[in-house]
């Protein structure tokens, strides 16, 4: 059995593509079961946020092509996703999970929301009965690594969200926000 992660994120695809592969929270348990029903798939976790969708699987002979095709079929897309997907196996999959949990793979370096999103995704997979010893160990380790990164580095000292980064940038343009109006799009 091999650990594999296939995903799409803010670096590999524009928002127009990413939003088409977001999983509705209420449908994730069903999606987890469908994903696990693929041949030789033993364990699954689906991480789905505004900036990334990732499929973590423990399986035999399963790669980017099969998972990409499943993602495309599940969302009813007529266009292949292979040009927007990334794929990591074994040690690289572990390293990737640690980077994601720590906020090192986020649009804004060090943003803390992703850790909570990973915990939610893992909890949903546990409730759906699609985790097992490999993904349990991976996600528990990723949570520990993320906590250690946050406590032993200054990664969260600066802007920790796109909104706080935008406010910081606006402060360089305007001396004061008094009598200013802002329009938020997105």
Map each language-model feature to its residues.
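Glycine/serine-rich phosphate-binding loop and adjoining beta1-alpha1 elements at the start
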Residues: 80-180
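Hydrophobic Val/Ile/Leu positions in short beta-strands of Rossmann-like dinucleotide-binding domains
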Residues: 182-184
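A glycine-rich (often HGG/GG-containing) alpha/beta subdomain
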Residues: 1-106
């Amino acid at each position: 059995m091999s650990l594999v992660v296939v995903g799409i994120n803010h670096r590999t695809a524009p928002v127009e593509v990413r939003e088409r592969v977001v999983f509705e929270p209420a449908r994730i348990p069903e999606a987890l079961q469908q994903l696990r029903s693929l041949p030789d798939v033993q364990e699954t976790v689906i991480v789905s946020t505004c900036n990334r969708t990732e499929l973590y699987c423990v399986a035999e002979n399963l790669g980017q092509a099969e998972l990409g095709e499943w993602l495309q079929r599940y969302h009813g897309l007529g266009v292949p996703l292979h040009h927007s997907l990334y794929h990591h196996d074994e040690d690289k999959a572990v390293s990737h999970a640690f980077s994601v949990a720590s906020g090192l793979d986020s649009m804004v370096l060090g943003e803390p929301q992703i850790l909570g999103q990973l915990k939610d995704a893992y909890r949903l997979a546990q409730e759906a009965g699609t985790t097992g010893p490999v993904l349990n160990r991976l996600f528990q380790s990723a949570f520990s690594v993320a906590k250690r990164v946050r406590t032993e580095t200054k990664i969260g000292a600066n802007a920790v969200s796109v909104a706080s980064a935008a406010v910081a940038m606006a402060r360089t343009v305007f001396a004061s926000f008094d009598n200013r109006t802002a329009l938020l799009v997105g």
